[in-house]
């Protein structure tokens, strides 16, 4: 019987569906809470062979993957995928290299450079942390005063926040479309609708989701 370890830090619907699917396909699942896990880096003191990496935390995810891969464990997704997929700037450059259209983006490596960018490129801009999710620390900057305050605050945080990543503000209906792609095939999609008075569509911030039918478009 096939055996797979699911490494997690939060049990969500997706993990429950994976467990249910494993049972239907006669696959043994071992659930391991990464928050309770410690590993001797110099000894292979476990019998884990294949891991589905499901940690929500980016740093917990990539560091635990690095450890397990270093000990010969097959991890899905692999370390390289985890690093790139969890960083918006890295992902943007991969999409650009692949010829996939994305909102125009700019990066500045200091407050002075960021303010110069605003002076030359204008407003509005969306500022996002390169690492993060659920719409946290994502702001729409409309003028120099708000730019100065937001970037000044980020400069006092962890060095990851000193990488100032900006995207154009896309004028759209109060919804966007999130599509799941496997290989070259779009397999599922949802509409994400903004909550009243909020331009963000994150469901974590009050947005709502509904089914989006996959079409040739």
Language-model regions, residue ranges each:
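Anionic group-transfer/hydrolysis microenvironments
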Residues: 35, 55-56, 130, 169-170, ...
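Phosphate-binding site of ATP-dependent enzymes
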Residues: 139-217
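Active-site nucleotide/adenylate-binding loops and adjacent lid/helix of ATP-dependent enzymes
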Residues: 2, 8, 44, 69-72, ...
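Short glycine-/acidic-enriched loop or helix-start segments at secondary-structure transitions
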Residues: 15-17, 61-64, 87, 136-137, ...
């Amino acid at each position: 019987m096939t055996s797979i370890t699911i490494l997690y830090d939060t049990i969500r619907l997706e993990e429950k569906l994976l467990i249910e699917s494993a049972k239907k396909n006669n696959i043994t699942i071992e659930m391991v809470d990464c928050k309770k896990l410690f590993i001797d880096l110099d000894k292979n003191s476990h019998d884990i062979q294949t891991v589905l990496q499901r940690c929500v935390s980016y740093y917990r995810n990539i560091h635990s993957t690095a450890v397990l891969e270093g000990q010969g464990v097959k991890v899905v997704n692999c370390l390289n995928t985890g690093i790139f997929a969890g960083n918006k700037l890295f992902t943007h450059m991969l999409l650009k290299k692949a010829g996939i259209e994305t909102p125009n983006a700019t990066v500045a490596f200091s407050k002075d450079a960021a303010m110069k960018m605003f002076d030359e490129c204008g407003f509005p801009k969306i500022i996002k942390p390169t690492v993060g999710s659920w719409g946290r620390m994502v702001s729409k900057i409309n003028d120099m005063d708000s730019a100065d305050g937001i970037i000044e605050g980020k400069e006092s945080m962890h060095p990851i926040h000193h990488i100032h990543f900006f995207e154009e503000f896309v004028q759209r209906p109060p919804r966007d479309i999130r599509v799941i792609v496997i290989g070259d095939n779009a397999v599922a999609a949802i509409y994400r609708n903004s909550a009243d008075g909020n331009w963000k569509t994150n469901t974590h911030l009050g947005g709502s989701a509904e089914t989006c039918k996959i079409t040739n478009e």
